[in-house]
Amino acid sequence: GEITPSCSRFPTPSGIFRDAIGLSKLIPSIFKPGIIMADWDHKESKFVDQVMGAFMFMRKSIFEKIGYFDEQFFVYYEEVDFSKRLSEIGGKSFFDAEIKAIHTREGTTSSVKAFRLFLNLQSRLKYAKKHFKSSGYWCVWFCTFFIEPLTRSVSLLFSDKKNEIPDLFKGYWLLLKNR
């Protein structure tokens, strides 16, 4: 197997904006990724904002104190929200580089790319509404509906994934229909 970036920074409106326009991919020497910690090799253990929910351990007492996972987040952002609430009570997430786990990336949703995109974007908007001020939420909303469709389309056009363009449009159509 290979090491997959599995830790993230807490989302912020500016981080989402930077990722939406692709600054970390265009100028990685200046702009680090806004959310996914792809700029770190994950070879050493350290405290991070958030670890991927596919493989987390915690004391039951902490889980109960925070209030479990928020059910409004389905498949995506549930661990981000949980970790954010953990940090708000002074808790921390720790990434242990010695622990190995096998995770089939997109295993649940690999055959439904449009639906996966819809769920991810929908959960991100719910996270923004829950954790950001109104201006931050509307910044994320604008990025989601106006900037990202364009940058994602251009990125797919200039890649070997042109066949995913219909899924991109279908995912955004689902988001528009279900907002």
Question: Model-predicted segments: where are they?
Answer:
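Acidic/His-rich active-site region of diverse nucleotide-sugar glycosyltransferases
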Residues: 2-66
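A short, conserved alpha-helix in the catalytic core of glycosyltransferases
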Residues: 40-100
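Nucleotide-sugar-dependent glycosyltransferase catalytic core
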Residues: 74, 83, 100-123
